[in-house]
């Protein structure tokens, strides 16, 4: 698969993104600079083949209904990847985001020490905001792993898609992916309290209902983390 070589290239170059669109070569983004990988112009049928190889039958059906698909997966010895498949001007486009395989420690990210204190709180709402590519996902993963390493309890995440995979350490970590482990955001957030979490991650607050749920979790004695664009 052409993506196998691209994944390897992303890891070697520490690239953040790959862009695959019809009518132009595949582009790679390295340290904020976007450039073509080669001179081969991608055709719609070439991209469609790549997209459908990435999706399961269930994901294919959902994509054909909504024309949008988010998915993630890990490649051994390379890392984790988040993929967005969408339509533009009548053809399929793909954007791949490279996510480091190992969750970095908070101290390695040169972040304010207060983040380590916040993630150990018993209750409250912590919002991580920033532009695309600013490190929101990595920051939250590092915070959650800090709690996982240092406090017993139950951490529940609701994500679309799952980006970092956590190991059970002092805490039990249950990760739910929209479309795979739960029908939709509404169902996952409605049932979260029945799963007795101490700490909840809402992968992204996208609407009023998700924000209301986050506030309700914090007000009922839980620590809730979420991202906002």
What residues fall within each predicted segment?
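Conserved P-loop NTPase nucleotide-binding/switch module
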Residues: 32-35, 161, 193-229
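Switch II of P-loop NTPase G domains
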Residues: 103-107, 182-187, 205-211
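N-terminal "pre-motor" subdomain/linker immediately upstream of P-loop NTPase catalytic cores
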Residues: 1-129, 139
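Conserved glycine(s) of the Walker
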Residues: 135
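P-loop NTPase switch/communication element
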Residues: 120, 126, 141-196
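Alpha-helical segments flanking ligand/cofactor-binding loops in enzyme cores
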Residues: 8, 116, 145, 190, ...
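Histidine-centered active-site/metal-ligand motif
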Residues: 19, 27, 146, 154, ...
């Amino acid at each position: 698969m052409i993506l196998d070589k691209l994944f390897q290239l992303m890891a070697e170059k520490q690239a953040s993104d790959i862009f695959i669109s019809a009518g132009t070569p595949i582009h790679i983004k390295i340290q904020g600079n976007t450039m073509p990988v080669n001179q081969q112009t991608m055709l719609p049928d070439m991209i469609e083949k790549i997209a459908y190889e990435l999706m399961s039958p269930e994901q294919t059906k959902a994509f054909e209904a909504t024309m949008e698909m988010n998915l993630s997966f890990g490649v051994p010895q390379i890392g984790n990847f988040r993929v967005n498949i969408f339509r533009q001007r009548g053809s399929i486009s793909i954007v791949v985001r490279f996510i480091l395989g190992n969750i970095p420690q908070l101290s390695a990210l040169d972040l304010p020490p207060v983040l380590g204190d916040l993630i150990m709180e018993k209750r409250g709402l912590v919002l991580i905001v920033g532009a695309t590519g600013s490190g929101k996902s990595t920051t939250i993963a590092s915070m959650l792993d800090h709690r996982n390493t240092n406090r017993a309890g139950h951490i529940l995440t609701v994500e679309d898609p799952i980006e970092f995979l956590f190991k059970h350490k002092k805490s039990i970590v249950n990760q739910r992916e929209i479309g795979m482990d739960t029908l939709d955001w509404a169902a996952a957030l409605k049932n979260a309290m029945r799963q007795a979490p101490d700490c909840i991650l809402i992968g992204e607050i996208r609407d009023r209902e998700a924000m209301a749920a986050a506030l309700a979790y914090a007000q009922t004695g839980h620590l809730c983390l979420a991202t906002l664009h």
